[in-house]
Each structure stands twice: as structure tokens, then as C-alpha cells.
Amino acid sequence: MHRSARWGLGAVGAGAALIVGLDLAALGEMDPFRRTISEHGLGERGWLFGLGVALLAVGSAAIGVSLARRRLAGVVGTVALLAWSAGLLVTAWFPKHDWSVGPSLSGSIHRAGSVIAFLSLPLAALIIARPWRAERHRAALAAFAFGIVAVLWVLGMGAVVMVGARSGLAWWQVMPLGLVERCLAAIEVIALTALGVWAAGKPVGLVEETSAG
């Protein structure tokens, strides 16, 4: 098992478990259907949220390094995966808007990091896994499949927002934002985990060159 991938999967698992734990601990205080995951960053457990997201980011970067070293990922795919990691680090460091006091620069930076992260991971999964579909490696196929699901999910969110805008509704009013975001996050973490399992697996053979992705 490739060491970077092994540590990466461990960090991703720990980060995801920590964030799920925060959700479970806050069930009586916060509506997960309406409140986003980043809401945890505003409370007294904010440091735990930051730690969980940072673990996800570091684990993702380690998986990206493993994929690149094994020549399973090209430059474009690796950059996309690192963009996801960078976006996560931004969301961990900068808290979201606290609407009880109004918008803030930190909240705007947090939102930008979230958008970069959520858009980059599906692209990374598709770009990295697509050239390897012929190898029929289950983890690579899973990463590609969940990458497609994530893209379709994002497109669906965009379509709903556009329909709501035509009706005069703000984007956060047209869907149960917390639920939608959590589903997207779960889909993307599954795609990431599949990439990690693929990177940690046995070599699929000597590769003379990879695609541009």
C-alpha cells in the first residue's frame, strides 16, 4: 500500500468522522436540513470543525501526491485535487458569515473557498479516473461515477437557484440548503475515498505515459 495514500485515507476518514460527530452532537441545537455544515465553525466547537476540515484537506493532498507519484494522475487532475484541498483549508481558516451580526470579509472568503472546493473535486475525479476506465479498476470506476453524480448534483442546484430567482426567491430559500450541501459533501468524500483506495491499491501495471489529466 502506498504510504501517502494510506495516511491520506486515514486523515480523510478522521476528518469526516469528526464533522459527522459535530452534526450528531448539535442535532438538538441546529437544523441540519437548513443550516450548512460551516455553521459549526461559529460555535464553541468551531476549532473542532476547523480541525476536521483541515484533516480532509491534508488527507486529500496526500492522496493527490500518491496518485501523481504512481503516475495515475496527470498535471490537470492533480491541480484540480489540490484546488479542492486549498479550498477546504480556506473554509477551515475563515469562518462563514455570522448573520446575527451581518456579512463579513471572512464570510466572503469562506464562501469563495467553499465554491472552489465543491467544484474542484468532481472535476478532479473525472479528469483523473476517466483515462483509466478501460482498466476496470473498481475504485477508479467508482471515483468516475461519483464524480459524475457530483457534477449532476451541482447542475441541479444551479437549475433550482435559477428557477427560484425567476420567482423572486433568494438561492437559500429555494432548497433545504443544509441537506443539499451535506448530500453533495458526502458524494464528493466518497469520490475522494475511491481515489484514495485506488492510489493505495496494487499497481495496475507499468505506465509509460499518462493523459494530460
Model regions: which residues?
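Terminal transmembrane helical module of multi-pass membrane proteins
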Residues: 130-213
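Alpha-helical transmembrane segments of multi-pass membrane proteins
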Residues: 13-31
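Membrane-interface interhelical loops and short amphipathic "cap" helices
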Residues: 29-44, 98-107, 166-177
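Membrane-proximal helix-loop-helix units in multi-pass membrane proteins
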Residues: 90-135
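Interfacial segments of alpha-helical transmembrane regions
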Residues: 2-10, 72-83, 136-149
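Interfacial helix-start motif at the membrane-water boundary
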Residues: 39-58
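Juxtamembrane helix-break-helix junctions at the cytosolic face
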Residues: 63-73, 126-141
